[in-house]
UniProtKB/Swiss-Prot annotation:
This is Protein translocase subunit SecA. NCBIfam families: PRK12904.1, secA. CDD domains: DEXDc_SecA, SF2_C_secA. Gene3D superfamilies: Helical scaffold and wing domains of SecA (1.10.3060.10), P-loop containing nucleotide triphosphate hydrolases (3.40.50.300), SecA, preprotein cross-linking domain (3.90.1440.10). Monomer and homodimer. Part of the essential Sec protein translocation apparatus which comprises SecA, SecYEG and auxiliary proteins SecDF-YajC and YidC. May bind 1 zinc ion per subunit. One of its GO terms (molecular function) is ATP binding. The keyword Metal-binding applies.
Length: 901
């Protein structure tokens, strides 16, 4: 009560942000008459004027009112649209590096032009991030008219572009692109070997459209570039055949946390089947069967937790994941740790190889690279705490241009799903009777097709929009507001196209008049469409506007709000209602058994619903609990990813320094001296007597790393010799050998060799380190049983592993340079031979790839001492890369087999 009183007197936090901005809106409005009088050329000249003022020391904020007035006038002349005052407010909030929450239909796409133009004046580049290629292309063409009119360059990044096209797009003042493409370009850039090959410029300012979808829903899924490992497809198929034999008593399932485990009885059953199939000796949990346990667990998850047409669909011999928030197909995204391969085995499609990570980053860490970040969406307030804590972004609610006149009805709760769907069909029939359009939101393909079948039986014409048919999605959504139209859609999040009452003129013009080339005929037909849409719009308004029906509550209130927000745009009438049953996932998982008994006691008959505001409140509390749990999961994942992120920044910074350096000989010499110092310290401990020195081991180390056979044992017998003297002698011999090798070639060739090798070995070491980090992460949670904090344990061990990687890197670089034999007849030949080989068949995915032993060898394009490896001649095996399979045929890595010696 006191809170409400205080808000009435002092205003909300939101009001306090917007109040000082209103005087800037007045300033923009005051400039409008003068700017209307400017010619096109005079308006365009404003860009050069603003840039000159910035160079002379004027702050961006001081240019805001004039820049916004310029964009408003340019939009009127190019698009025929004028920014409303509330849109100016939204643009100012975005310029400040905050999130603008603007309701659906309030023109977010147009709002972005204001801060984009202002920040693009610095010529450092502005990125506008969208959720799919269609929206990136559409917005770059549509809003690009405004920027180009004002003399700015506009680029777009979409899938399938080559590096040159990407460089040109990123060099533009304004660049549109999807979150996936921008993130992958960052990773690919940090796998390049020359600065001029990199496509992105230093980060400056980004505006993220549908910011909640990208920074919250997709935050858990890392972007990964990976390379293939060995083929385990037969084992997946063999284990998969055992799963249908399991009965309910063989496993326990927890749907809240999406986990399934074998019971003792199930373990015995599986062991028996594995022995019969001759896949196992001993018991399932013997140390030698670790890989088998992994395959059994993933097959169990694939069969008992994942449902076809709900979690994934099968299309073109592939298992494609369906995004639980948007209902879209996630092409190229794969489940981690062998789960995707287990699903492929379950569905009988081609099993793709597991992969090893070459580079990865989460969206959380990618977008935190921008010095200035802003976002816009229709629904962010429910996640305001997360935006503030993780991204340091404040959410500001922008008032609507016209008051919302949508009626949000209380939820109707039925006992069974059958009754619920029958009630939805009845409501659709009623709406069609008065020609009111209906949009039904479902949570899965399966449910959308079930409802579609029910409507077909009633002979009710309708459109279905789900992951299967997403090619036509923009047109289907645009036409969802026609009189009597019925549209069924899996989660409406991120669809990006307005539902306009009566129909969408732009979309109909594009689809229906594509073949009409005669200008006069085209104008005539467009006028006809306009008149038809206006008549339809009036009919729909009279029938009550768009009726949005939710077929169940999502676990996130935000997704429900997004569905509701499709109705009642720009002051249009509309209505919304959610239909629920006790068989819905949210109700079933969060304690519906008690509720079922209660409803029976109340005498609820078949087909009757219970409707009460208290039920809405109870459901909202259940959703808040799920949201809080999901936030904790994301926050915890970020803490773990931050450990790798700090290391990634160090490695990527070092790579960039190496690429920009012409000469790395100083680093090479420092590496060599540090390696010798560490060798001597290991074999000749401080303050140890001469008879305690391990000179034999030191001799072996020097021979292995430097290919130098030195009389170290003889030196050790000399009277009064100290460890420093031995160290100096080894250093002297190693330096002389390196100098002799440099003298054989031109200085430029040797510099090229050193730089190329250093970059390639750094990449190989980083790749192996990522694999070790992943293995560490998978088992670290078990430390909690020993009363240790898994996060602190992970931080400590990851830091030690990183330090060890850097030590190993010095030794590997030193050793390769000492052993390598260079055979070049010309500098051109040297350049070709030193051109690093790109990893073959890399894959870009939106999930952690599965890991298994094995991997590709170091990508050296240099002739080493024994380059030809003969499997029948152990004398040639020394040339085998450390991570390649051992030539003996054991299946182990070379470094763990014959290379260990």
């Amino acid at each position: 009560m006191f809170g409400a009183l205080a808000r009435r007197i002092f205003g909300t936090a939101n009001d306090r942000v917007l109040k000082p901005l209103k005087k800037h809106v007045e300033a923009v409005n005051a400039l409008e008459p003068a700017f209307e009088k400017l010619s096109d050329d005079e308006l365009r000249a404003k860009t050069a004027e603003f840039r000159a003022r910035l160079e002379s020391g004027t702050e961006l904020n001081d240019l805001m009112a004039e820049a916004f007035a310029t964009v408003r006038e340019a939009a009127k002349r190019t698009l025929g649209q004028r920014h409303f005052d509330v849109q100016l407010l939204g643009g100012m909030v975005l310029h400040q590096g905050r999130i603008s929450e603007m309701k659906t239909g309030e023109g977010k796409t147009l709002v972005a032009t204001l801060p984009v133009y202002l920040n693009a004046l610095t010529a450092k580049g502005v990125h506008v991030v969208t959720v799919n290629d269609y929206l990136a292309k559409r917005d770059s063409e549509w809003m690009g008219q405004v920027y180009r009119f004002l003399g700015l360059t506009v680029g777009v990044i979409v899938h399938g572009m080559d590096d040159l096209e990407r460089q040109q797009a990123y060099a533009c003042d304004v660049t549109y692109g999807t979150n996936n493409e921008l993130g992958f370009d960052y990773l690919r850039d940090n796998m390049k070997f020359r600065l001029e090959e990199m496509v992105q410029r230093p980060f400056n300012y980004a505006i993220v459209d549908e910011v909640d979808s990208i920074l919250v829903d997709e935050a858990r899924t890392p972007l990964i570039i990976s390379g293939p490992t060995e083929d385990n497809s037969d084992l997946y198929r063999l284990v998969d055949k055992l799963m249908p034999s399991l009965v309910a008593e063989d496993f326990e399932k927890d749907e809240k946390v999406r986990a399934v485990t074998l019971t003792d009885r199930g373990t015995e059953h599986v062991e028996e089947m594995l022995r019969t199939a001759d896949l196992m000796k001993g018991t399932l949990y013997d140390i030698g069967n670790v890989s088998l346990v992994h395959h059994v667990n993933q097959a169990l998850r694939a069969h008992k937790l994942f449902t076809r047409d709900v979690d994934y669909i099968v299309k073109n011999d592939k298992v494609i994941i369906i995004d639980e928030f948007t209902g879209r197909m996630m092409e190229g995204r794969r489940y981690s740790e062998g789960l995707h391969q287990a699903l492929e085995a379950k569905e009988g499609v081609t099993i793709q190889n597991e992969n090893q990570t070459l580079a990865s980053i989460t969206f959380q860490n990618y977008f935190r690279l921008y010095p200035k970040l802003a976002g816009m969406t229709g629904t962010a307030m429910t996640e305001a705490g997360e935006f503030a804590e993780i991204y340091n972004l404040e959410v500001v609610e922008i008032p609507t241009n016209l008051a919302v006149s949508r009626t949000d009805h209380d939820d109707e709760v039925y006992r069974t799903a059958k009754e619920k769907y029958e009630a939805i069909v009845t409501l659709i029939e009623e709406c069609r009777g008065r020609m009111q359009p209906v949009l039904v939101g479902t949570t899965s393909i399966e449910k959308s097709e079930l409802l579609s079948d029910m409507l077909k039986k009633k002979k009710i014409p309708h459109q279905v929009l789900n992951a299967r048919y997403h090619e036509q999605e923009a047109y289907i959504v645009a036409q969802a507001g026609v009189p009597g139209g019925v549209t069924i859609a899996t989660n409406m999040a991120g669809r990006g196209t307005d539902i306009q009452l009566g129909g969408n003129l732009d979309m109909r013009t594009r689809m229906e008049l594509a073949d009409v080339t005669d200008p006069a005929e085209r104008v005539k037909r467009i006028e006809g469409l306009k008149a038809e849409i206006e008549v339809n719009k009036q009919k729909v308004r009279e029938s009550g506007g768009l009726y949005v029906v939710g077929s169940e509550r999502h676990e996130s209130r935000r997704i429900d709000n997004q569905l509701r927000g499709r109705s009642g745009r720009q002051g249009d009438p509309g209505a919304s209602k959610f239909f629920l049953s006790l068989e819905d996932d949210l109700m079933r998982i969060f304690g519906s058994q008690r509720m079922d008994g209660m409803l029976q006691k109340l005498g609820l008959k078949d087909g009757e619903a219970i409707v009460h505001p208290w039920i809405n409140k109870a459901l909202e509390k259940a959703q808040q609990k799920v949201e809080a749990r999901n936030f904790d999961i994301r926050k915890n994942l970020l803490k773990f990813d931050d450990v790798m992120n700090d290391q990634r920044k160090v490695i990527y910074e070092q790579r960039k320094d190496l690429m920009s350096a012409d000469d790395v000989s100083e680093e090479i010499v420092a590496f060599r001296h540090e390696v010798i110092a560490e060798m001597v310290a290991r074999c000749i401990p401080e303050r140890a007597y001469a008879d305690q020195w391990d000179v034999a081991a030191l001799h072996e180390e020097v021979l292995r790393v430097f290919n130098l056979d030195l009389p170290i044992a003889e030196w050790g017998k000399e009277e009064g010799i100290a460890d420093q003297e031995i160290r100096d002698r080894i250093t002297d011999h190693a330096d002389r050998k390196a100098a002799a090798k440099v003298a054989e070639y031109t200085p430029d060739t040797m510099r090229m060799v050193e730089k190329s090798l250093l970059l390639q070995i750094l990449d190989q070491a980083w790749k192996e380190h990522l694999l070790q980090l992943d293995h560490l992460r998978q088992g670290i949670s078990l430390r909690a049983y020993a009363q240790r904090d898994p996060l602190n344990e992970y931080k400590r061990e990851a830091f030690n592993m990183f330090e060890q990687m850097l030590l190993d890197l010095r030794e590997r670089v030193t050793s390769v340079l000492a052993h390598v034999q260079l055979r070049f007849s010309s500098e051109e030949e040297a350049e070709q031979a030193l051109e690093p080989q790109r990893p073959a068949r890399t894959q870009e995915t939106r999930e952690d790839p599965a890991f298994s032993s094995g991997g590709s060898g170091a990508p050296f394009a240099l002739a080493q001492r024994n380059t030809a490896v003969d499997p029948n001649d152990p004398a040639t095996w020394a040339a085998t890369p450390r991570n390649a399979p051992c030539p003996c045929g054991s299946g182990k890595k070379f470094k763990h087999c014959h290379g260990a010696a």
